[in-house]
């Protein structure tokens, strides 16, 4: 991808924002080197890794990168066999600790979704507990070795403490006895040796070695003779300490050197994970989504937003290109926000092709392009002595030399800066040439000739940016299929130009041109209304589809439970009948044996006894089956009341009755989070088992202890989250909690809005607010209960 388009579309600003989320210097460098990938496979893989990281962030929070530093320099030194500094070893030790924690963090639990790419990277991490432990035991901070690093160091430092204590006692004694000769009644240290501040005129009164003097020369720092031997002993111990520390550092450096290949691999993986999670964190704060990537030149962006415009000011637009038409001409006045649309499309393409989530709605599509070209703005300099037209044409010539059917070309005010007639003709010729090559093209223009060109040319479409004449400002909403209107007369009138001047101007323009402009305005108004209607219809359609899928899933789940219950009953019935059949076969065999023996009176008695046994077995089997059926059904309800608990045998689950029987004999019941209609005659009396009674009593006694101060609603849809939060708030209210926290995550804000709407109507809620810094920010809602 050419560097010019990255600069013109301000992709470097995006990289600076992403860099702010990276921790290590190496990961920050990876971000700054980021640019569109060369193959569609690479684009999809890097987008997928970003989406996986975002999913983990939403489910588990931030990865454990605490204490991580860039250790590239330390690794380079260790590879050469050099002795590492205390700081270098500490940072490698911290990196190994992060390796261990990351390995645990990325390990997938059975119930969690698979993250193919990140789990594959996790498998490359090798935990070096021995090296990590040896470093953490020996090093306390970036400039301190622990006493416990070795027995010898411990012994040396203990001796140092004793000697320092002795010399302090001695020097304090000397200070007290020579107060009249001293500048201050304090001792100090010069060159690791204890000295006292003696007035220059009394230096002969305090025998010893002069180590330093004050800037004025009035004070001499003298080491009293009585301290020389003690200072020498301390100096020797300090030299031994230094030698032992160097030995420990050398020993740890050798340990690192022996494992340097593994350490290097671990660091490279961690840097890449740091880079990936930086992309995901930026995408999360941006409200970005995973785009669908195609190779057909199709761009379909829904609710696309420019990522560098603040969220409270940016206006989203639907931008599409590549299916019905390959060239989009955005027409209208120069102040109409056309360039913003152009840059939004190009920048979103660059972001997606670089593995970043895009600021658009779910299921938006981008196309893989080998090159994106842009001629936007005036980039000529005074030194070059180029006019606006010459500057643009220089760029266009370069584009024409390289563009092909795998290119996306962006033109801002194509043909501007010269005679309008010649400029329009030249613009049409350039567009035709690039269209013949199969390029995808977006261009802005204010030439009327290009509006007509788009209207009569196949695969070329007009578009405009909606303009509010009342406020004299663009709304920045893109209207595809409607050419732009100049609005020159309306704007001039709003700014105070006299009507007679405007009317004179209209006379200069042909009637056909005025009618054409009026037609455009009418089209604009109709298009805006149609677009608004389409948006509302799409929202309703999506909601209907969502509810349809949700209830279809619930129905299938109920059907599955019912089928399982029936299957279990059939299996048990078959077992009873098989057992009875086996016993009956045995009895019949005995009867046949008796008949072969002859019919004596004794034999007849035995035969009748066996027949009796057979009848009893069959009756017993029938009774057991009937009893099982009755047990499964339970006792019928004599009376149905709203709010009562009942048993629904078809799903073998207790339900709550929500309505009286209707004219079909059906009632609505709630089973868990599901609401379903069933026949009233199918409901049975719900009986509590002893165990359930015990649990209820225990819950009543321990209610306060069991209601947590917060609940995590992330991962749920709005309906399930509201139901769960409602039940939780009831429990918290009964338990007497005054304040609770609902964790809904930041995400797109849909879940937060649903929770907020529910809280406004909840009977137990006194007030609620978003979390503050340290509480979870906008990812949580703090609720004050009545």
From Swiss-Prot:
One of its GO terms (molecular function) is endonuclease activity. Residues 711-786 form the Smr domain. It is an enzyme of class 3 (hydrolase). Transmembrane segments: none annotated. Its EC number is 3.1.-.-, 3.6.4.-. PANTHER family: OS10G0509000 PROTEIN (PTHR48466:SF2), OS10G0509000 PROTEIN-RELATED (PTHR48466). This is Endonuclease MutS2. It comes from Clostridium perfringens (strain 13 / Type A). The gene is mutS2.
């Amino acid at each position: 991808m050419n560097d010019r388009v990255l600069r013109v579309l301000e992709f470097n600003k995006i990289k600076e924002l992403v860099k702010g989320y990276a921790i290590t210097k190496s990961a920050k460098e990876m971000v700054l080197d980021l640019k569109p990938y060369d193959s569609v496979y690479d684009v999809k893989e890097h987008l997928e890794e970003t989406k996986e990281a975002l999913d983990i962030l939403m489910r588990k929070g931030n990865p454990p990168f605490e204490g991580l530093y860039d250790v590239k320099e330390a690794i380079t030194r260790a590879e050469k066999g050099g002795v590492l500094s205390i700081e270098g070893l500490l940072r490698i030790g911290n990196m190994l600790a992060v390796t261990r924690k990351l390995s645990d963090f990325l390990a997938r639990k059975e119930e969690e979704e698979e993250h193919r790419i990140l789990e594959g990277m996790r498998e490359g991490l090798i935990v070096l507990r021995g090296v990590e432990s040896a470093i953490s035991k020996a090093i306390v901070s970036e400039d301190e070795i622990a006493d416990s690093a070795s027995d010898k160091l411990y012994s040396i430092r203990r001796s140092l403490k004793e000697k320092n204590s002795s010399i302090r006692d001695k020097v304090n004694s000397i200070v007290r006895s020579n107060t009249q000769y001293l500048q201050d009644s304090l001792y100090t240290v010069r060159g690791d040796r204890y000295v006292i501040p003696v007035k220059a005129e009394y230096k002969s009164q305090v025998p010893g070695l002069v180590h330093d003097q004050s800037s004025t020369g009035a004070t001499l720092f003298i080491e009293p003779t009585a301290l020389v031997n003690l200072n020498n002993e301390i100096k020797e111990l300090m030299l031994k300490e230094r030698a032992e520390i160097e030995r420990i550092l050398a020993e740890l450096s050798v340990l690192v050197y022996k494992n340097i290949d593994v350490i290097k691999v671990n660091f490279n993986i961690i840097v890449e994970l740091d880079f990936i999670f930086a992309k995901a964190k930026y995408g999360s704060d941006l409200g970005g989504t995973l785009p669908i990537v195609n190779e057909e030149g199709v761009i379909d962006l829904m609710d696309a937003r420019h990522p560098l415009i603040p969220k409270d000011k940016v206006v989203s637009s639907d931008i599409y290109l590549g299916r019905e038409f390959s060239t989009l001409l955005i027409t209208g006045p120069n102040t109409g926000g056309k360039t913003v649309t152009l840059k939004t499309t190009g920048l979103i393409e660059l972001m997606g092709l670089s593995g970043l989530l895009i600021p658009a709605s779910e299921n938006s599509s981008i196309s893989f392009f080998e090159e994106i070209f842009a001629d936007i703005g005036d980039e000529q300099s005074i030194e070059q002595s180029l006019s606006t037209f010459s500057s643009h044409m220089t760029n266009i010539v370069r584009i024409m030399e390289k563009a092909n059917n795998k290119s996306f070309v962006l033109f801002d005010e194509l043909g501007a800066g010269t005679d309008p007639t010649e400029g329009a003709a030249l613009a049409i010729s350039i567009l035709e040439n690039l269209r013949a090559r199969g390029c995808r093209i977006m261009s802005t223009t204010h030439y009327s000739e290009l509006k007509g060109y788009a209207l009569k040319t196949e695969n070329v479409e007009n578009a405009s940016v909606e303009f509010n004449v009342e406020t004299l400002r663009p709304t920045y909403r893109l209207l595809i299929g409607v050419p732009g209107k100049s609005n020159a007369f309306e704007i001039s009138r709003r700014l105070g130009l006299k009507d007679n001047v405007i009317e004179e101007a209209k006379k200069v323009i042909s009637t056909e041109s005025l009618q054409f402009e009026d037609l455009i305005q009418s089209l604009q108004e109709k298009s805006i209304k149609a677009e608004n209607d389409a948006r509302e219809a799409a929202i309703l359609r999506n909601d209907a589809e969502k509810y349809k899928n949700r209830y279809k899933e619930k129905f299938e789940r109920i059907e599955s439970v019912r089928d399982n219950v029936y299957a279990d009953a059939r299996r048990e019935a078959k077992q009873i009948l098989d057992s009875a059949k086996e016993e009956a076969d045995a009895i019949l065999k005995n009867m046949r044996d008796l008949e072969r023996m002859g019919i004596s009176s004794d034999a007849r008695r035995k035969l009748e006894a066996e027949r009796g046994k057979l009848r009893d077995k069959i009756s017993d089997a029938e009774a057991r089956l009937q009893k099982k059926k009755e047990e499964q059904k339970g006792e019928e309800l004599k009376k149905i009341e709203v709010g009562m608990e009942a048993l629904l045998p078809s799903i073998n689950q207790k339900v709550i009755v929500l309505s009286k029987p209707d004219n079909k004999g059906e009632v609505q019941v709630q089973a868990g989070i599901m609401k379903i209609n069933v026949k009233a005659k199918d409901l049975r009396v719900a009986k509590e088992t002893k165990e359930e009674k015990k649990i209820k009593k225990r819950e009543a006694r321990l209610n306060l202890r069991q209601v947590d101060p917060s609940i995590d609603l992330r991962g749920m849809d709005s309906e399930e989250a509201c139901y769960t939060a409602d039940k939780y708030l009831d429990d918290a209210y009964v338990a007497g909690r005054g304040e609770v926290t609902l964790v809904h995550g930041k995400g797109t804000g849909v879940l937060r809005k649903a929770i907020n709407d529910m809280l406004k109507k909840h009977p137990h809620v006194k007030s609620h607010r978003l979390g503050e810094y340290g509480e979870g920010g906008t990812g949580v809602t703090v609720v004050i209960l009545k």
